[in-house]
Amino acid sequence: MAAPQRFLPAQAYTDPRMHHWDCSGYAQRYWHPLTAGSALPAGHSLALTLLNQPLLLTRAEDGTPRAFLNRCPHRGVAFQHEREGATACRRLICPYHGWTYSLEGELLAAMREQGFDPPFHRQDWPLPSLPCREDGPLIWVALTQAVTPLEQQLDLVHQRVADLWSQPLDQVRIL
């Protein structure tokens, strides 16, 4: 008689159905570390993909990291491509129609907005934001508002490595 298998079979990690389930369900409930905080200086944006979702991280001059879907709400065009890395910018400008957003996600300008019928209101077109926090040396993002609290998710990390957690990643050496 064969011993019961105690681990998932290898094909579970390569099965496209499992990947879809992970991306569309299970992993949506948790925070994900996307980058080191030091990789996103103030006045920069960074395009990344998380669970097949194109994201754009920004850090305005106030130092707060923010996460948005990397697509203009007007026509869905990406603001920035991943291959560009962290990019210094004061605004996000859609390459399609030139809609211009602040790094906080506020619509600052839209082409020919006076000619819209019904009347156009900028405050109705913010960038869709996602939960985003900096904890320790990392920037964490969740893809839904219904997410496990970050403090709960990182409780064990905070207990075990609290002294290292506040250090920049380039100064941490794990043995």
Task: Show where each model-derived region lies.
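Hydrophobic alpha-helical packing residues
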Residues: 94-97, 132
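FAD-binding glycine-rich core of flavoenzymes that anchor FAD
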Residues: 76, 100-101
